[in-house]
């Protein structure tokens, strides 16, 4: 190896380590996301159970679904930035690792394989937290849509009964 090639390899190693550490910054956020998802899930389950048991939808239920939706979207906005950065940094790490063009030496493990085996589980954890957050946001959105549909049907029923009573009054007056 000449000095130029050695310098490039050292630079690649430094870049790999820097971007790997930057990607791992999302791991605490992913752990926090998983714990918050449990809380959000319980709140959503309670709201859905209340929706199923309620004969009429009240303003408190509508307010709770709106609050939960707001909380999930707010937390999602905070987490997405970090999760997106992790994805980008992980791609850079993979790119830099492939640029090393390692060759296997006897029974020794390549450094790229070593890094990958220790780095990818963390990246997959972040991706799983992001996926679960997306699924929860979708479920909250569906619950909100269902609640809005229920309110709309109730309003239509009220309007129909009002029209019926108005017709009866008009018939009585004639």
Feature map (PLM): residue ranges:
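Membrane-associated alpha-helical segments
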Residues: 69-174
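Amphipathic alpha-helical surface "interface" segments used
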Residues: 64-68
